[in-house]
């Protein structure tokens, strides 16, 4: 791979990562397809994906930095009253706990058995079905904003997040759907999903980077930098656009799109 082509690949995959990481469409499925079409696969590609994923994480931090600082008691501007319930670090810990416990136990097994195109294809379909169920059967909204989310709801979202251990299911799709099925508004569920992503993805990406540290070299720095910066910028735009859209649109189009991507995976890799 020439240096110019490597930078082109980094730019394209950075766009794909930034667009799909926080939408309920599965970034894994898209990265598998686009990586295959670009001829960029294997251990180095997997390490590159982890690095540019960190760019997407940084975008969430940039969008929700006030909320993230608030979780650790640092407030900018007017501090909320003491008797006013707000999103806290406890909510995030409860949301993380199930996936952390299960993920640590089966991380190696997932890497060895669930990263194939066929299993990702099934996950795309299953995640699409869950989105439809969440839209069609969600109960009356009891938690309209982030600060209305209860500890029980946060833990329930954490249980749904375990579904995203199945590559292709979509972490945001699982957590947003779970939140909606527990009476959280679409907007609040999406915002909680994004904030919850920061510690979860930092932990998962950090573990993957540590395990693949031997594959990192200064020669790859330009490619990794282009992918990282592109993913950061595109993810910033995608997050803000997505949060604006879901105020007036439901998730059915995303479910249909997932089925289309699953069919594309079938045609390219399975048929």
Curated annotation (Swiss-Prot):
Query: What topology does the record note for this protein and the membrane?
Result: Multi-pass membrane protein
Report the domain of life of the source organism: Bacteria
> What are the record's GO terms for cellular component?
plasma membrane
Alphabetized UniProt keyword annotations = Antibiotic resistance, Cell inner membrane, Cell membrane, Cell shape, Cell wall biogenesis/degradation, Hydrolase, Membrane, Peptidoglycan synthesis, Transmembrane, Transmembrane helix
* E.C. numbers: 3.6.1.27
Cystine connections: none
Query: Has UniProt tagged this entry with the keyword Cell inner membrane?
Result: yes
Q: Main EC class of this protein?
A: hydrolase
**MF GO annotations:** undecaprenyl-diphosphatase activity
Q: Which InterPro entries match?
A: UppP
TM spans (from-to): 5-25, 45-65, 86-106, 114-134, 149-169, 189-209, 226-246, 251-271
Q: Which reaction does it catalyse?
A: di-trans,octa-cis-undecaprenyl diphosphate + H2O = di-trans,octa-cis-undecaprenyl phosphate + phosphate + H(+)
Q: Where in the cell is it found?
A: Cell inner membrane
Other remarks? Bacitracin is thought to be involved in the inhibition of peptidoglycan synthesis by sequestering undecaprenyl diphosphate, thereby reducing the pool of lipid carrier available.
- What family is this protein classified in? Belongs to the UppP family.
Q: What does this protein do?
A: Catalyzes the dephosphorylation of undecaprenyl diphosphate (UPP). Confers resistance to bacitracin.
Q: What is this protein called?
A: Undecaprenyl-diphosphatase
Q: Which organism is it from?
A: Aeromonas salmonicida (strain A449)
């Amino acid at each position: 791979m020439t240096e110019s082509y490597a930078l082109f690949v980094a730019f394209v995959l950075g766009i794909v990562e930034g667009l799909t990481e926080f939408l309920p469409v599965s970034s894994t499925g898209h990265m598998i397809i686009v990586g295959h079409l670009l001829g960029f696969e294997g251990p180095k590609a997997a390490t590159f994906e982890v690095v540019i994923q960190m760019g997407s994480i940084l975008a969430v931090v940039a969008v929700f930095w006030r909320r993230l600082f608030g979780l650790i008691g640092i407030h900018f501007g007017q501090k909320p009253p003491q008797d006013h319930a707000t999103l806290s670090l406890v909510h995030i810990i409860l949301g993380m706990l199930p996936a952390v416990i299960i993920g640590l136990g089966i991380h190696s097994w997932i890497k060895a058995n669930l990263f194939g195109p066929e299993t990702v294809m099934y996950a795309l379909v299953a995640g699409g079905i869950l989105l439809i169920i969440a839209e069609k059967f969600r109960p009356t909204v009891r938690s309209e904003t982030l600060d209305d989310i209860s500890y029980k709801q946060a833990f329930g979202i954490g249980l749904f997040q375990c579904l995203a251990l199945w590559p292709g299911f979509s972490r945001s799709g699982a957590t947003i759907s779970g939140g909606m099925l527990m009476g959280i508004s679409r907007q609040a569920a999406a915002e909680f999903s994004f904030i919850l992503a920061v510690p979860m993805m930092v932990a998962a990406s950090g573990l993957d980077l540590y395990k693949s540290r031997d594959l990192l070299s200064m020669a790859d720095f330009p490619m990794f930098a282009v992918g990282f910066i592109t993913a950061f910028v595109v993810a910033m735009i995608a997050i803000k656009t997505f949060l604006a859209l879901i105020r007036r649109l439901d998730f059915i189009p995303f479910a249909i799109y997932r089925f289309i991507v699953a069919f594309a995976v079938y045609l390219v890799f399975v048929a």
